[in-house]
Regions:
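Intrinsically disordered, low-complexity repeat and linker tracts
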Residues: 1-51
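Non-catalytic cap/lid and distal C-terminal segments of serine-dependent acyl enzymes
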Residues: 31-206
């Protein structure tokens, strides 16, 4: 009888390497949105990847200087605002860019101070402008910022030293400030300067 030959299974000479998984591209980080789906960044604008140091000459006066003006308006005492029983006369310091014209419309930036401060802290006064105003002037003049209006108000209530009282300032005045901002300050600003608001009603300001 013939001897059966053993069956030999062919084996590859080289063990194949595992297929490398392609590196996945990270998904773009979604910008946080507010309740209306707004990100606060225009579609054609890019957020810089790093902060830029302010050039030293920006702290000196620019050739093209914006102006500071006082805006006086009426509001009500913060703690009893809803009763509207005690009127207050307040002011905000407003920055108007170089070449401001009523024939053009401007965006408005509301810039609030912190503790132990007031409406003059950021930009100074018309008589004594602060150094930070120079920075804004240069940035606008160099095209790094579009011409815009800055409004510096204060949440100080009945005393210029209110912001130095931590309990009063951060426990009451800043919490209540939205009443004054929405009902009194913004309408005063939008009704005085050339902005994108159609009128000073809540619908017009939106």
């Amino acid at each position: 009888a013939e001897t059966e030959k053993p069956v030999v299974t062919d084996r590859p000479d080289v063990t194949p390497l595992p297929t490398e998984k392609p590196t996945e591209e990270p998904s773009p980080t979604k910008k946080p949105e507010d309740d209306n789906g707004n990100t606060g960044v225009a579609e054609n604008e890019k957020i810089p990847k790093k902060l830029q140091e302010i050039p030293a000459d920006y702290y000196t006066e620019a050739d093209r200087q914006g102006s500071l003006v006082e805006l006086n308006y009426e509001t009500y005492e913060s703690r009893t605002y809803e009763q509207k029983s005690r009127k207050l006369n307040k002011r905000a310091i407003v920055y108007l860019p170089y070449g401001y014209s009523e024939n053009e419309r401007y965006n408005v930036f509301y810039l609030m101070h912190g503790g132990w401060s007031n409406e003059t802290t950021w930009l100074g006064t018309p008589e004594r402008p602060g150094t930070f105003k120079n920075v804004i002037d240069h940035a606008v003049s160099d095209g790094k910022m579009k011409p815009f209006i800055i409004v510096c108000p204060t949440y100080n209530n009945e005393s210029p030293s209110d912001s130095g009282d931590y309990t009063l300032a951060y426990g009451t005045l800043t919490v209540n400030y939205h009443n004054e901002l929405m009902n009194d300050l913004i309408p005063a600003v939008e009704g005085t300067y050339s902005t994108y608001a159609d009128n000073v009603t809540p619908e017009g300001i939106k």
